[in-house]
Amino acid sequence: METYRMKGIYGEGDVYVLKTIEDWDEYEKLCRERNSDFLKYNPNFFSLKEDFEKYIGKVWQDKEQLRYTYNDEPVYVEYKVIAIEDNNPMMDWYWIVQNVDDDRDVKSILANSCDLKNGIKIK
């Protein structure tokens, strides 16, 4: 699990990036250590874990972004689901997707996202 420090308009906070199921387990342990009632207040936690296991590493096509046409068949922009990030386990999760032609790492993608435009640094 990678942890970054986010600076935003409401202050600073940690951003957790989960790329593997082992990262997920580490994050779950961290959340339970911080708050023993974590799962009580986050009933969707395990359904999100199932989604994570199903989609991580998968490639999907964006049917709204035509890349080119080959033999009169459309070829769409493809993205790979590379991670999810969370800056507040009680709030929202964000899927991190990467264009399959893009070779940037997760940190670069996060640094260019609108949520982190005010700066990000490795913790």
Predicted regions and their residues:
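Short, intrinsically disordered N-terminal pre-domain segments
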Residues: E2-Y4
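Acidic, low-complexity, intrinsically disordered interaction modules
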Residues: M6-L116
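Mixed-charge, Lys/Arg-enriched low-complexity segments
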Residues: N118-K123
